[in-house]
Amino acid sequence: MQFPAPLKSNSIKFLLLGSGELGKEVAIEAQRLGIEVVAVDRYPNAPAHLVAHRSYVIDMKSKEQVLEVIFREKPDYILPEIEAINIEALFEAEERGFRVIPNAEAVNKTMNRKNIRKFAAEELGLKTSQYRFVSSFEGLQEAARTLGFPCVIKPVMSSSGHGQSIARNEADLERSWEIAKEARGDASELIVEEFIDFDYEITLLTARNETGTVFCPPIGHIQKDGDYIFSWQPMQMSETALQKAKEIAKTITDGLGGRGIFGVELFVKGDEVYFSEVSPRPHDTGMVTMITQSQSEFALHVRAVLGLGLGFTFYTPGASAAYKAKHESFTPVIEADESVFDQESFLRVFGKPESHEGRRMAVVLTLAETAEQALQKANELIAKVSDQ
């Protein structure tokens, strides 16, 4: 494959729709191959804006504005990095010959929990929790009574856990309803899920293109309010469960098709594995791969997009701990104790231009002989990070 210089008439060009911390790492990996990177987001100086050749600030939900950037830039590949994008623009771009990663229909299915759950459970026959879709509080009450308590309630469209809650009894439903309605994204319809008393949950990063499909070692993670706070790799699991996880991941990613990396989220109980969700892009829990693998999830994504081989080496166990802001600031500062910077730990500051309470601003990455030791170390070091 040839790699022309960027900013030339024959450059290979990526258009990132969404420019957060994951998009930033994709941009960096793309630039390592001389790819011209254009980053788009709804606010200025987003993380990927800071490392791109050019950037745009637009309303990502506006079909006209998204298409205007696509037609102006004429990218070789369009990489949606967030859910909140006008899907009609992606379908039209694809119809006009632009290559959407992995493809517009996969983005459409995965940005909406109703679409992907119906596709996974009803079309592909994958094992999932029981579920109902509701659009009124009365419908929520009826669904919760049918499925039983506790139950999980989420908007059909939201990202990073926004709007997600667990109702443990009838009295919790009103609060769950309000949480869902306040979420970013479309909260006009909710999914109510049976609560699976799982042993643990994993992300199985799955990269695919015409050269084949590869699986990264499973990543364990801990969520709070539906958003990841810790992850570690590898997650210890039985060979039977791991094989089932790979079969589910292969089925769902083959069903969606296209090139790229997918974050397949799964619940595991004993040797039983349940499909939860899938993201057709790098996954936040996968930031740990920046130090555990010869090719991070971001490098694998870029290679998959370009049709390159997907081989990699798993180096060593590791863990990640997300740092969320505790203060509101238009001039945020991340502070870290010197002990965070030892030979087997790393701090990645995302460079977001503003901090809001609970906004993810940085991540600590740690290596150790075991994933458990790495997780313990990450937990200790994240306590030595602060913001102002």
From Swiss-Prot:
Keywords: ATP-binding, Ligase, Magnesium, Metal-binding, Nucleotide-binding, Purine biosynthesis. GO terms for cellular component: cytosol. The keyword Ligase applies. SUPFAM superfamilies: Glutathione synthetase ATP-binding domain-like, PreATP-grasp domain. It is an enzyme of class 6 (ligase). N(1)-(5-phospho-beta-D-ribosyl)glycinamide binds at residues 21-22, 81, 284, 352, 359-360. Its EC number is 6.3.1.21. One of its GO terms (biological process) is 'de novo' IMP biosynthetic process. NCBIfam families: PRK09288.1, purT. Involved in the de novo purine biosynthesis. Catalyzes the transfer of formate to 5-phospho-ribosyl-glycinamide (GAR), producing 5-phospho-ribosyl-N-formylglycinamide (FGAR). Formate is provided by PurU via hydrolysis of 10-formyl-tetrahydrofolate. Belongs to the PurK/PurT family. This is Formate-dependent phosphoribosylglycinamide formyltransferase. It comes from Nitratiruptor sp. (strain SB155-2). The lineage of its organism: Bacteria, Pseudomonadati, Campylobacterota, Epsilonproteobacteria, Nautiliales. The gene is purT.
